[in-house]
């Protein structure tokens, strides 16, 4: 992990819907909660615009974050983020404390590379389909990857890349695979465009008819 994210936070005593509305309207902050780690949950308030800017960076969602509560720092991950149903406004955030000695479950983005240069695409006209854009991993906080790279260069036409095909950093496991082989889900594939198979079939039939 190459980036550090620090979120300024403030103790929050007033709770409830009315207090949360005042917080958002008058102070430009949103309510948040920090929980887990064998400690009591801590209600805090954080600057709305600061958080909104931070989440523009994809890495924010797969990093260990630092929440600074007036000098007291907590290491956390973002577990949930609530948004207004139709306005570009954040309404609440949940942060989970992390311990360097305990594994965490985090959704990490998948970065697909060599999509355009893969022979099945460039030479055979295949189309890449993404079944997943992120994957839940299990690891110690210090091993948390910013993203997982999926190289499509060697993927052949009609081949499917599964979770078990992912190349994971040391100390990182795919959560779904811990539940057995039945959970080895597809991640991406390369296939012919719609209509191409039908055209191929018609071409084969025409060749057979010509031979007669």
Swiss-Prot record:
GO terms for molecular function: 5S rRNA binding; structural constituent of ribosome. GO terms for cellular component: cytosolic large ribosomal subunit. Keywords: Ribonucleoprotein, Ribosomal protein, RNA-binding, rRNA-binding. It holds the Pfam family Ribosomal_L25p. GO terms for biological process: translation. InterPro entries: Rbsml_bL25/Gln-tRNA_synth_N (IPR020056), Ribosomal_bL25/Gln-tRNA_synth (IPR011035), Ribosomal_bL25_b-dom (IPR020057), Ribosomal_bL25_C (IPR037121), Ribosomal_bL25_long (IPR001021), Ribosomal_L25_dom (IPR029751), Ribosomal_uL5_bac-type (IPR020930). Residues 183-212 are annotated as: Disordered. Residues 201-212 have a biased composition (Acidic residues). This is one of the proteins that binds to the 5S RNA in the ribosome where it forms part of the central protuberance. Part of the 50S ribosomal subunit; part of the 5S rRNA/L5/L18/L25 subcomplex. Contacts the 5S rRNA. Binds to the 5S rRNA independently of L5 and L18. Belongs to the bacterial ribosomal protein bL25 family. CTC subfamily. This is Large ribosomal subunit protein bL25. It comes from Marinobacter nauticus (strain ATCC 700491 / DSM 11845 / VT8) (Marinobacter aquaeolei). The gene is rplY.
């Amino acid at each position: 992990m190459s980036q550090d994210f620090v979120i300024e936070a403030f103790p929050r005593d007033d709770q409830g819907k009315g207090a949360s509305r005042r917080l958002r309207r008058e102070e430009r902050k949103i309510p948040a909660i920090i929980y887990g780690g064998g400690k009591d949950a801590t209600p805090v308030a954080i600057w709305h615009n600061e958080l909104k800017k931070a989440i523009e960076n994809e890495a924010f969602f797969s990093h260990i974050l630092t929440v600074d509560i007036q000098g007291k720092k907590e290491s956390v991950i973002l577990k949930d983020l609530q948004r207004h149903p139709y306005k570009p406004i954040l309404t609440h955030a949940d942060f989970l404390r992390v311990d360097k000695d305990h594994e965490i479950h985090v959704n990490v983005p998948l970065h697909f590379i060599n999509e355009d240069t893969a022979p099945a695409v460039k030479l055979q006209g295949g189309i890449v389909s993404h079944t997943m854009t992120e994957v839940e991993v299990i690891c110690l906080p210090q091993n948390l990857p910013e993203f997982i790279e999926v190289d499509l260069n060697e993927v052949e036409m009609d081949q499917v890349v599964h979770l078990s095909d992912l190349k994971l950093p040391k100390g990182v496991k795919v959560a779904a695979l811990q539940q057995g082989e039945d959970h080895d889900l597809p991640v991406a594939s390369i296939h012919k465009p719609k209509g191409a198979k039908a055209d191929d079939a018609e071409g084969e039939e025409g060749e057979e008819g010509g031979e007669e």
